[in-house]
Amino acid sequence: MTTTPKPLVLMILDGFGHSESHESNAVYAAKKPVLDRLCASMPNGLISGSGMDVGLPDGQMGNSEVGHMNLGAGRVVYQDFTRVTKAIRDGEFFENPTICAAVDKAVDAGKAVHILGLLSDGGVHSHQDHLIAMAELAFKRGAEKIYLHAFLDGRDTPPKSAQSSIELLDETFKTLGKGRIASLIGRYFAMDRDNRWDRVAQAYNLIVDGQGQFNAATAQEGLQAAYAREESDEFVKATTIGEPVKVEDGDAVVFMNFRADRARELTRVFVEDDFKDFERPRQPKLAGFVMLTQYAASIPAPSAFAPGSLENVLGDYLAKNGKTQLRIAETEKYAHVTFFFSGGREEPFPGEERILIPSPKVATYDLQPEMSAPEVTDKIVDAIEHQRYDVIIVNYANGDMVGHSGVFEAAVKAVECLDLCVGRIVDALEKVGGEALITADHGNVEQMSDESTGQAHTAHTTEPVPFIYVGKRALKVREGGVLADVAPTMLKLLGLPKPAEMTGTSILVDPAH
């Protein structure tokens, strides 16, 4: 018979890194008595959430999808970014059967190949090198008409940094002698993930019907006109370039984002016959629509890189051992604490319950830096008091989502709100004898301005993230921990042996070590 759940709570403070620099550091500037007290009195240290330590290229900043995959898997997960880059380097990409089938069908009928994707070197949702490779693939397979519909970043990159990326793609098309950038739009519209269909509709109508609010002779001119309207990359309004292009019946469309969460909505508009979230002017009958990776199992389109399966991730292993678990987050990070933390699995494991708290409906989260954290905390405190679960896994979105706004004062408020929430959870746990681990998936809010450009720093960082144990046991934190070590640490606290698939090792060790 299992004992009464104590619970063990894993708090993931999204985008909450540690920087030795105090410049533009919202974590340093915030009044955070609870976290300060825990760091002074509890076993704690820093762990890595970027680069090779999470299965990304060396020096690449971490992100929420990658972070949660590693946290939940208990092993370093080879990321889609790295898989695609390697396939391009090895030449396998240019023979990819799924992409080639769609491109060849369009080419044989004398039709166009449309490339969609985030044009950026941010490496979080996409990489411009992948877009270049796709243009080269289309050219090599005989496409006469190659159109890039570029989504601009300014979020995982500096707010006004798209010019160099546009120049690079213009140069690529010039070298190939075929193809061009057909449209520009900010990711705010094309890559929504919060069912703001009015935004997605603007991107869809731009791509499919060549309907933009603005037109420019070249992509460079289109970008400069947007800057003159005081739009940073993320918010560039729908702009057609040159003679407006439409997606015609028989064309092929390849979506080159490798990260799923912000590619799903636009993809659904293209491929779902019964799509009803807004009135489509038309749905082209395509030679093929290819997702670079599987954006969701329910989307009726093939993917170029099929998902790898992860066995015995934390959620699965807890279920097999008869443990109950709660996953809870607000809308912005719900997919991360469920789908990504479960290794790319949509449905809950046996004994797993989920609570989704709606994110506030504001244009940008600097307008409401507390987001829905207080409501999330209410639910967790209630669950702890009633001892309903063995394990509670929560994501707090504030550090990341407010960090992305680039507004320092709001970021400080976000950190201060988090401190209050952590305090409430720790107090509730003390009353029932529970334990907690506090960590993050990657950095962001600890660097709010870019010293080299003087612009707001809206992107993630490569900084390490905190790791704090909250409980009564005499344990110490070892050096060199990574996100993949968090699940094995939780199993140690729960008294469960680690499955063979988990190659991570506990960050908490006995003081004798």
Swiss-Prot record:
EC number from the UniProt entry:
5.4.2.12
Q: Which residues bind substrate?
A: H125, R155, D156, R187, R193, R259, A260, D261, R262, K333
- Which residues make up the binding site for Mn(2+) 1? D400, H404, H460
Q: What class of enzyme is it?
A: isomerase
Q: Does the keyword Isomerase apply?
A: yes
Annotated SUPFAM superfamilies: 2,3-Bisphosphoglycerate-independent phosphoglycerate mutase, substrate-binding domain (SSF64158), Alkaline phosphatase-like (SSF53649)
State the disulfide connectivity.
none
What pathway is it annotated to? Carbohydrate degradation; glycolysis; pyruvate from D-glyceraldehyde 3-phosphate: step 3/5
Keywords (A to Z) from UniProt: Glycolysis, Isomerase, Manganese, Metal-binding
Q: InterPro entries given for it? A: Alkaline_phosphatase_core_sf, BPG-indep_PGM_N, Metalloenzyme, PGAM_B_sf, Pgm_bpd_ind
Question: Which processes are annotated in GO (biological process)?
Answer: glucose catabolic process; glycolytic process
GO-annotated molecular function: manganese ion binding; phosphoglycerate mutase activity
Residues where Mn(2+) 2 binds = D14, S64, D441, H442
Which residues of this protein are catalytic? S64 (phosphoserine intermediate)
Name the needed cofactors: Mn(2+)
Q: Which reaction does it catalyse?
A: (2R)-2-phosphoglycerate = (2R)-3-phosphoglycerate
Q: Which Pfam families match?
A: iPGM_N, Metalloenzyme
One GO cellular component term, please give it: cytosol
The record's free-text note on cofactor binding: Binds 2 manganese ions per subunit.
User: What assembly does the database describe for this protein?
Assistant: Monomer.
NCBIfam families (alphabetical): pgm_bpd_ind
Q: What does this protein do?
A: Catalyzes the interconversion of 2-phosphoglycerate and 3-phosphoglycerate.
| Record family assignment | Belongs to the BPG-independent phosphoglycerate mutase family.
- Full protein name: 2,3-bisphosphoglycerate-independent phosphoglycerate mutase
- Species, as recorded: Pseudomonas fluorescens (strain ATCC BAA-477 / NRRL B-23932 / Pf-5)
